[in-house]
Design a protein with these regions (language model features):
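Gly/Ser/Thr-rich loops at beta-strand to alpha-helix junctions
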Residues: 6-13, 62-73, 88-90, 118-121, ...
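A short beta-strand-loop structural module common to alpha/beta enzyme folds
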Residues: 25-41, 201-203
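N-terminal glycine-rich phosphate/adenylate-binding segment common to multiple enzyme folds
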Residues: 50-101
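Extended, charge-rich low-complexity interaction segments
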Residues: 54-73, 113-129, 223-244
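Long, charge-dense
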Residues: 80-128
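Extended, basic/helix-rich recognition subdomains
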Residues: 152-244
């Protein structure tokens, strides 16, 4: 098959490694991680633009995304089917499936996950940084910048309320996928040490990523959206569904 993969850059190393061994021809377009930080409704617009830019020579378009806080809701297939994993977010793909992610999530509250993509590409930059919810709410300001704008008392309250997005976390889970350069785990450990958080290595699983680029998409793990139909959120455990 001739496939097109549109993926979040958070999967850069993993998708490249999987595509290198795919039995199919797979052309890749990576989109910036910062799409997740846009105001509600804007990520689907950017995703649709990327899909509409694909020419009609492909048998299917693969989406290297989870539902991502409804970031794919409303996205429509045009000339060929869309294939996407049944996943709320990217951690499902890094851990190989929904069941393993749910098991870990339920037993390890307050966990912040790290992979090579987050360490290398986790910061939103460029035009997307200016458009992000964080920038529009002032969540990207330092405490000193807030003091200068709002006064000391107001600044401390706003900083605690808006800018401490990790205050409910206390644990780093490093997910090695077998594609990282030497020393990256040590970088992750250093980040945990800087925050005084606990640290754990949770082995990653490339199974779902490989299935995405290898074809043979089973209905339990993947949604196939035929031309003319769109993606919608599902609330019956299937996570995503198709709609005319």
């Amino acid at each position: 098959m001739n496939l097109k993969l549109i993926s979040c850059e958070i999967f850069y190393r993993e998708m490249c490694a999987a595509v290198a061994h795919s039995p199919h021809r797979v052309d890749i377009t990576f989109l910036p991680k910062g799409l997740h930080d846009l105001p509600p409704g804007q990520m689907p617009v950017k995703m649709q633009e990327a899909i509409d830019a694909v020419d009609g020579t492909y048998d299917a378009i693969l989406l290297g995304y989870g539902l991502c806080n409804n970031g794919l809701a409303g996205v429509r297939a045009r000339n060929c089917p869309l294939i996407l994993p049944r996943a709320h977010d990217c951690i499902t793909l890094f851990l190989g499936g929904r069941d393993r992610y749910r098991e870990y999530f339920d037993t390890h509250p307050g966990t912040y996950f790290l992979t090579s993509g987050w360490l290398e590409r986790g910061e939103t930059s460029g035009d997307l940084a200016e458009l992000s919810v964080q920038a529009q709410l002032g969540m990207n300001l330092t405490l000193q910048e807030m003091v200068e704008q709002y006064g000391e008392d107001n600044a401390e309250y706003l900083y605690e309320t808006l800018c401490q997005g990790t205050r409910n976390y206390s644990h780093f889970a490093w997910i090695p996928m077998g594609v990282e350069p030497p020393g990256m785990e040590q970088t992750a450990r250093q980040k945990a040490g800087e925050r005084g958080w606990s640290f754990e290595t949770v082995p990653g699983d490339m199974t779902l990523i490989r299935k995405l680029v290898n074809g043979g998409w089973n209905e339990k793990e993947f949604l196939t959206v035929p031309p003319g139909s769109a993606v919608k959120a599902a609330y019956d455990g299937s996570i995503v569904a198709g709609i005319q």
